[in-house]
């Protein structure tokens, strides 16, 4: 994806990467987190006030200052001195300007280094050790950005004995669950025909694999409550005392006895954490999902807007979410009332969990599938309605004489064509790990007349002479936005067609890109201007992010919209349809997305986009595969008054408006340009 210009950024790659890093950084997202800001501010006020009451000065160190916000809060709270450090140079330069524009340039000493590089002493980075540390070094896993090592270094070299630390402590919570939806993103299932006949069985090593070791961070509040069975209450499994170097260990284990509250198979652990911001624990910041959030019941009684669902009543943030950790594979159910031991482990950066297993090692993928494919791709492979629709169409158009070339990565549907009775299947698998996975499926299922090629160049003239059909789901691991799969399929298809001297049937026949105007409840905050934040002017940071975003970012980005609720403000709009067989031709389309209920809703702040694939020439719901909303939002239907339900196995496209659309406007103009040679679609919105 690129901007609405065909020209690539002309600077060097390092400069482009740096601009993109600034544009996509979470600095603005964190500053939009009003609860975080207010609770850091309150903790600073309480801490500095208490030190002064004890007759002590408050010398504050702010590690990773970002915008400079926490340092400015410390000055406002009465700190006697403030030293801030920021290693990311563009952000440090911006913080310097922000601090100066707020009249605090002479009150805050900004050092453009990592905290581990700071030196203490006369004429050095810090004149003296600090007795107050304020920092935000956390991610969804709490420790994934190296918080333990940073705190340990600061406590040893940069802080006085008995210093105050903000936040003071963190508690990690875990909840054991049975969650088929989460498991659909982890473990491939049997693939069956519409008659229930098994087409492909899954190799045991893939069923039993622990999966990817990368954190699975999600907005747990958006999981439907009916999609999981809580086998336990949330329990605290670890506490981190950020003021004690001795207590901050790089590796720990805890065994936690709990009573099963609901019968079921233990499949996963939901994890989150909270922060006690001050020494006395009077200020608490929780990252819990709504059903476990300490403020939820109180917020529910204050609810005034019926359009906001209960999961969105709690403070929203995207920089700290919750995480899912898969337990070692088990088919043994737990009984209600049974006592079990939840073993929790962490190293310097990550977590893992087990049941009744003191020696459990960190999980990693041993089968290759979780290395080759993302969790959402595994979800697509397990998507029953999608698979059924595609298989039904393939059963209609293929017969025992069909020789099918499959283009794409990890297509179990393509592989199943042989099990359906086709004469031969040829898979092109350019990714070595994906190719190994497909070979294991072939071997495990005893499939014959299946040829797996490492590249199209391996396609022989004899093989091409027999091809009757070319099929793609389509899916390619290189694609980010859903329609990029179809565009890559067209590119590969054109290469194959150059080798053919006869006509073949191509599936899918075409694809379309749709858009709808929406009001995001929270997602718009990741790019919305900050302006004033807790009384401080951050407009200079707004300007920096906007300038870099214009250069480095596409107007359409990928987001899993099932995690980010939005309300539709009008019917869906078909923006472009591309015939796959004729996809070598450039195409330009223009139009308007209409808003039929703009006056009812607070604001239009974005456009949601998705792709639909049409298997055959005659387009119908039966042969259409959508990566978009599950709700009907056409002109003939009444728009839903609740947030749209989205396909949770895809990331959709999102265009976020820098400023909400004016209330008087009832449409938004758009241009889509498909460039076949550059393999991309350009979008422009006015």
UniProtKB/Swiss-Prot annotation:
Its EC number is 2.1.1.-. It is an enzyme of class 2 (transferase). Pfam families: PrmA (PF06325), PRMT_C (PF22528). InterPro entries: Arg_MeTrfase (IPR025799), MeTrfase_PRMT7 (IPR014644), PRMT_dom (IPR055135), SAM-dependent_MTases_sf (IPR029063). Transmembrane segments: none annotated. It comes from the Eukaryota. Residues 5-352, 357-686 form the SAM-dependent MTase PRMT-type domain. Gene3D superfamilies: Hnrnp arginine n-methyltransferase1, Vaccinia Virus protein VP39. GO terms for molecular function: histone methyltransferase activity; protein-arginine omega-N symmetric methyltransferase activity. Keywords: Methyltransferase, Repeat, S-adenosyl-L-methionine, Transferase. GO terms for biological process: peptidyl-arginine methylation. Essential arginine methyltransferase that can both catalyze the formation of omega-N monomethylarginine (MMA) and symmetrical dimethylarginine (sDMA). Specifically mediates the symmetrical dimethylation of arginine residues in the small nuclear ribonucleoproteins SmD1 and SmD3. Belongs to the class I-like SAM-binding methyltransferase superfamily. Protein arginine N-methyltransferase family. PRMT7 subfamily. PANTHER family: PROTEIN ARGININE N-METHYLTRANSFERASE, PROTEIN ARGININE N-METHYLTRANSFERASE 7. This is Protein arginine N-methyltransferase 7. It comes from Aedes aegypti (Yellowfever mosquito).
